């Protein structure tokens, strides 16, 4: 038995909660209104995504191959040469024997650039470093191939678009992989620095007193140290590596976040809603990270793109001085050092310079747009 709904009454429908608050929508609109920063953001994301799939753009292995009816993915799986009738060794897909064997029993799809960052080009027309292929005539660029201009290996994918370095490695491939390492290193360092710096600043600003005094004196002493010299000394002692450099630079990079977060917590810790939360028995850590931290993150977010660009610049500087990534790693700093040592090959320094300039300019434009978006005094139409 069911009760009939009384006449004249309406069922109340709970309104749907919007995905974003009006403040967030206003900030996003302000960010989009800054056209230079908005398009720089998307251009940077596209370049970063392309660098993440660098193995499918620049590689000395085919993306996809078919051999005797079997589909192979050499770019992701290492197949021994024995599979193609050779020896039990790593397969060199650029050798004529392997290419003839696969083409006779199937097909191969190569990436646009048939070189990885560590592939040595043995068909350069003269001693390395060699110029980009478009600075040579057709006869010169194919002179190292057995059949010259008629050789099937002298194709656009096998030519060096931006030349080679002093070890006959493709500059374009090293630029793409170097861009990826620089951005990944900068992002990882920025996120780790933000976690440490925000936590330290929150503790200082919320508790105040002796906690704030002691930590502030420590930070003043720590930040007054010659960072670059200490980085060089530690990097010279420890074996080079991605995570070794990350740990070394994290020792000092977190300090930049402390002052901003500390000031926000000092300002907000005596607000009425904080006092009410304390009176209700809410714990200090809950108040800090659930109620105060969102307000402090506004200033922190505007600071992140500039910290990211600074992290990339520091890594490039260490690589340039020879204290960065391990030898052979794709590095923009190492490419700049090669350009300095090979002034007769200006394409080395110019490639690294323009890559760094574009990357840092995009990050600065994005940082300016984020800063304007979170500024309540600015409203764009």
Swiss-Prot record:
One of its GO terms (cellular component) is plasma membrane. The chain crosses the membrane at residues 38-58, 183-203, 230-250, 292-312, 347-367. Pfam families: BPD_transp_1 (PF00528), OppC_N (PF12911). Residues 179-371 form the ABC transmembrane type-1 domain. This is Peptidoglycan transport system permease protein YejE. Belongs to the binding-protein-dependent transport system permease family. GO terms for biological process: microcin transport; peptide transport; protein transport; transmembrane transport. It is a multi-pass membrane protein. Disruption phenotype: The deletion mutant is hypersensitive to ampicillin, in a manner only partly dependent on the beta-lactamase AmpC. Deletion of the yejABEF operon leads to the accumulation of anhydromuramyl tri-, tetra- and pentapeptides in large quantities in the extracellular milieu. The yejABEF mutant displays cell swelling and lysis as well as a severe growth defect. The keyword Cell wall biogenesis/degradation does not apply. It is found in: Cell inner membrane. The complex is composed of one ATP-binding protein (YejF), two transmembrane proteins (YejB and YejE) and a solute-binding protein (YepA or YejA). Part of the ABC transporter complex YejBEF-YepA involved in the uptake of muropeptides, the breakdown products of cell wall peptidoglycan. The import of muropeptides into the cell enables peptidoglycan recycling, which is vital for cell wall integrity in this bacterium. Is also probably part of the ABC transporter complex YejABEF, which is likely involved in broad-spectrum peptide import. Responsible for the translocation of the substrate across the membrane. Gene3D superfamilies: MetI-like. Keywords: Cell inner membrane, Cell membrane, Membrane, Peptide transport, Protein transport, Transmembrane, Transmembrane helix, Transport.
């Amino acid at each position: 038995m069911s009760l009939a709904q009384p006449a004249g009454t309406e069922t109340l429908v709970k309104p749907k909660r919007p995905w974003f608050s009006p403040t967030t929508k206003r900030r996003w609109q302000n960010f989009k209104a800054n056209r230079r920063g908005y398009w720089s953001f998307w251009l940077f994301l596209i370049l970063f995504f392309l660098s993440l799939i660098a193995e499918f753009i620049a590689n000395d292995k085919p993306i996809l191959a078919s051999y005797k009816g079997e589909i192979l993915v050499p770019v992701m799986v290492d197949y021994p040469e024995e599979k193609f009738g050779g020896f039990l060794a790593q397969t060199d897909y650029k050798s004529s024997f392997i290419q003839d064997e696969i083409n006779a029993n199937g097909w191969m799809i190569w990436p646009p650039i048939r070189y990885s960052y560590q592939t040595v080009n043995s068909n350069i027309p003269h001693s390395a470093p060699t110029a980009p292929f478009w600075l040579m005539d057709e006869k010169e660029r194919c002179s190292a191939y057995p059949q010259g201009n008629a050789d099937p290996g002298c194709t656009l994918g096998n030519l060096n678009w931006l030349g080679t370095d002093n070890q006959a490695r493709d500059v374009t491939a090293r630029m793409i992989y170097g861009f990826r390492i620089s951005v990944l290193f900068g992002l990882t360092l920025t996120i780790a620095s933000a976690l440490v710096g925000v936590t330290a600043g929150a503790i200082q600003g919320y508790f105040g007193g002796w906690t704030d005094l002691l930590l502030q004196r420590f930070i003043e002493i720590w930040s007054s140290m010659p960072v670059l010299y200490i980085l060089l000394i530690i990097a010279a002692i420890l074996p080079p590596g991605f995570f070794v450099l990350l740990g070394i630079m994290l020792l000092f990079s977190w300090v930049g976040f402390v002052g901003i977060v500390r000031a926000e917590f000092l300002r907000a810790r005596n607000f009425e809603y904080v006092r009410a939360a304390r009176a209700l028995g809410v714990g200090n850590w809950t108040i800090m990270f659930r109620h105060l931290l969102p307000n402090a993150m506004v200033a922190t977010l505007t600071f992140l793109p500039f910290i990211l660009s600074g992290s990339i610049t520091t890594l490039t500087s260490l690589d340039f001085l020879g204290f960065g990534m391990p030898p052979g790693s794709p590095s923009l700093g190492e490419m700049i050092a090669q350009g300095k040592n090979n002034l007769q090959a200006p394409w080395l320094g110019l490639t690294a310079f323009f890559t760094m300039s574009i990357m840092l300019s995009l990050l600065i434009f994005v940082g300016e747009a984020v800063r304007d978006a979170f500024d309540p005094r600015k409203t764009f139409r």
